[in-house]
Amino acid sequence: MKRNVLLSLLFVLANALAFAQIVLPPGASPQSPQDPGYQGLIASCKTPPPPPAARGGGPGRAGAPGGAAGAAAAPATFPPPPADYTVTAIPGVIAAGQKWTKVWETSGNNADGILADKDGNLLIAQNHNSAVVKLDQNGSVSPVYRDTHTGGALSMNKKGALFMVQRGLRENVTELAPTRRIHADKLANGDPLDCLGGVINDLSADSRGGVYFTMGGLFYADAKGNVTRYGESLTTNGVILSPDEKTLYVTNGRTVAAFDVQPDGSLKNQRQFVELPSGGGDGLTVDAAGRLYVTAGPAVHVVASDGKLLGSIPAPYGLITAAFAGRDKKTMYGVVSLIDPTRLQHAYVYSIPMAAEGYKGRAK
């Protein structure tokens, strides 16, 4: 027992150093490892979390070890000038010469998970503000949900149930609609999810009432909230189901892994789906044709349903996530996260016209 407590304390110290790289805005909601009560909670874990190095990766978009590159390092001037880029045509996906347009900006880690609502507006998870806001097609922002316990990524299933990862102390996957309730917050041994180490990064909700989520590894919380881990040698970040829900995609550093989804939601046949041309994969989305879109560095990589890399859509800055929205769901939105010289995060939402249509069978 004493050895486990010592290991837990060493983990807390290492994790605190990673989180100290980013300054919280005044009044911001802390993520679990930043909370003063985190050390005591971790010391009670039956199975202590592994050290950050064992989970792989640097700070991800959730600000947690184990993700992709995440927010860029503080530049000498802020914001840094945008990179020059030229969009070349990808047949059926995007026309040549299209440009990204900045449509909204805010301070803090306040534009993390994004997805479309039924009217084509963009729902945005605000991690530091513990809120969800709606960005309409006229550029106006209004609150939708408050007090989301440092809520991050969002996912809506085909039946309209909206789920969110909540990253405050005692992390959980929460259903926001139609009924607001905690969906999953414990592992099979009774430990809180915090005992996995770091914070929950992303999620994808299925039509069975279950939710796949990433937290260093890959997990599935079934309709009753029972959590099972899947996959081997994974350094996860983004996760999403194919339109037919027969395949689950999850980023794994410079590659994307795929799994066959079984009738009960369990996963089999882990395999490498595609190797990315640059950067570590972060956010994922799909279109109506079943193509997969992966944000990695200053680009969105487009992958056919058979794993063939079709091309890349360059961007002026590194993107942490992307989603289709708009009235016809033919606009792609991407989120940029930058850190200023005071170590404060800033979030920017960009949009670009697409030839491809986002999948309309669910929000993302």
Protein language model features and the residues they cover:
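Sequence-structural signature of mature extracellular/luminal beta-sheet repeat domains
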Residues: 21-364
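Bacterial N-terminal signal peptides
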Residues: 7-18
